[in-house]
Amino acid sequence: MSTINTDTNKTMPHISVNAQYIKDLSLENPSAPSSLAALDQRPQIDLSLDINITNLSEENFYEVELNIEAIARNEKYKLFQIELKYAGVFNLINIDSEQHPVLLSVHCPAMIFPFARKIIASCTQDAGFQPLMIDPIDFGALYHKKMSEHQN
């Protein structure tokens, strides 16, 4: 039988997820019911994603917010538009502050993204459409792209 040394765990670097929540959720189905009858072809999906990081008042506590917007269109209609702000509160424990930007921009969003993805899929399905299954996102590539653009 193994035991866990909690004193060692308190000093080990780690990320604690203190909360996850929907900050804002909006779904528009502007052309219903006509748009629901026109689902014989796959719609064009325009997707945008943004990440906002807020340093909270307590030391090493941060809110990481995913802003996801998806607009589905076909030849005739704007089928739906969904906007989701989904956030988590993270505590970076015993982690060097130089590592905070990459952890907050890559690892924390990757932890909460599956939950945001599920919310979007459920909402679009509840609106009468096929669930919108957003492909996995490489937050590391997004971070490196943003950093290279910032340096130029």
From Swiss-Prot:
Cross-referenced InterPro entries: SecB (IPR003708), SecB-like_sf (IPR035958)
Annotated compartments: Cytoplasm
Biological process terms in GO annotation: protein folding; protein tetramerization; protein transport
Quaternary structure and interacting proteins, as annotated: Homotetramer, a dimer of dimers. One homotetramer interacts with 1 SecA dimer.
Role according to the record: One of the proteins required for the normal export of preproteins out of the cell cytoplasm. It is a molecular chaperone that binds to a subset of precursor proteins, maintaining them in a translocation-competent state. It also specifically binds to its receptor SecA.
Domain of life of the native organism: Bacteria
Name the record gives this protein: Protein-export protein SecB
One Gene Ontology cellular component: cytoplasm
Protein family according to the UniProt entry: Belongs to the SecB family.
Secretion signal, residue range per the UniProt entry: none
CDD domains: Translocase_SecB
Pfam families: SecB (PF02556)
Keyword annotations of the record: Chaperone, Cytoplasm, Protein transport, Translocation, Transport
Organism: Rickettsia peacockii (strain Rustic)
PANTHER family given in the database record: PROTEIN-EXPORT PROTEIN SECB (PTHR36918:SF1), PTHR36918
Gene that encodes it: secB
GO molecular function: unfolded protein binding
